[in-house]
């Protein structure tokens, strides 16, 4: 995979499509959190389906600069899209790629599912896939307890992941406001036809009921599974690819 930097801070891996087509179709992948960047295999799969793929790290996470959650992660996606008109430069050998996407799609899971849903508010984004997405941060107290016994979640992240996430207590607490990076806060702006969600009813981290309620309130299509836990985005996309491809093309 190639590497590029956008807006000075945002580092991303990217791949061109395996076969060039008449249309430039781009998929942007949004990671969960906390997680280790390992969607390279998914990026390769999507490249073989003839899509450009960009796999960014949020500001303040992993290779990217900045402070995590200083800005809403979906703004990182918007900023990345802003720079595409300039083309993409591989930082390793300086090779330049021209990319003027005719269609832009976003795929995100869990924490990144919120980024995908909020990215759908951008008119340049045609469709998004949200896999076991966080749609309302009111779930935070219970989900934190499911992940760690540390009462200070941001402190846990700093201890467990070091500088992989430059996360302050103040920035983490912004999620509890109900307005910051929260799809539910934007329910009135959602275009239901742009979003497809996948979720398992036995998810231990993101309650199915919260996603079902979001789907009912917005009209967004939700494909449910009886079992599966906290679904892997890579496995979901590959297993459901024919469904996703049809959704993208309509």
Task: Give, region by region, the residue ranges found by the protein language model.
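Alpha/beta-hydrolase active-site loop
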Residues: 68-98
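Conserved alpha/beta-hydrolase
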Residues: 47-65
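N-terminal cap/lid segment of alpha/beta-hydrolase-fold proteins
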Residues: 1-22
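Hydrolase active-site cap/lid region
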Residues: 118, 122-170
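Conserved alpha/beta-hydrolase "acid-adjacent" motif
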Residues: 204-210, 233
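Catalytic histidine-centered segment of alpha/beta-hydrolase-like enzymes
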Residues: 228-239
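The serine-hydrolase catalytic nucleophile loop
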Residues: 32-45, 67, 209
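Short beta-strand/loop motif that positions the catalytic acidic residue
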Residues: 190-191, 196-199, 203
């Amino acid at each position: 995979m190639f590497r590029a930097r956008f807006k000075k801070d945002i580092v991303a891996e990217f791949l061109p499509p395996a076969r060039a087509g008449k249309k430039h179709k781009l998929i942007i992948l949004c990671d969960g959190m906390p997680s280790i960047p390992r969607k390279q295999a998914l990026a390769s799969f999507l490249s073989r389906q003839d899509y450009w793929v960009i796999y960014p790290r949020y500001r303040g996470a992993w290779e990217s600069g900045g402070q995590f959650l200083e800005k809403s992660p979906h703004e990182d996606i918007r900023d990345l899209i802003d720079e595409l008109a300039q083309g993409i430069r591989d930082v390793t050998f300086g090779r330049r790629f021209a990319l003027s996407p005719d269609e832009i799609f976003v795929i995100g899971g869990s924490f990144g599912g919120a980024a995908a849903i909020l990215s759908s508010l951008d008119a340049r984004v045609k469709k998004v896939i949200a896999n076991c997405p966080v749609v309302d941060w009111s779930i935070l107290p219970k989900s934190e307890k499911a992940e760690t016994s540390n009462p200070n979640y941001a402190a846990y992240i700093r201890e467990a992941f070091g500088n992989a996430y430059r996360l302050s207590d103040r920035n983490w607490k912004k999620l509890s406001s109900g307005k910051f990076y929260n799809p539910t806060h934007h329910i009135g702006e959602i275009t239901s036809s742009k979003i497809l969600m996948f979720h398992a009813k036995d998810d231990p981290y993101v309650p199915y009921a919260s996603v079902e309620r979001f789907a009912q309130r917005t009209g967004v299509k939700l494909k449910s599974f009886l079992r599966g836990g906290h679904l892997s985005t890579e496995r979901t996309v590959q297993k459901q690819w024919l469904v996703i491809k049809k959704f993208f093309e309509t």
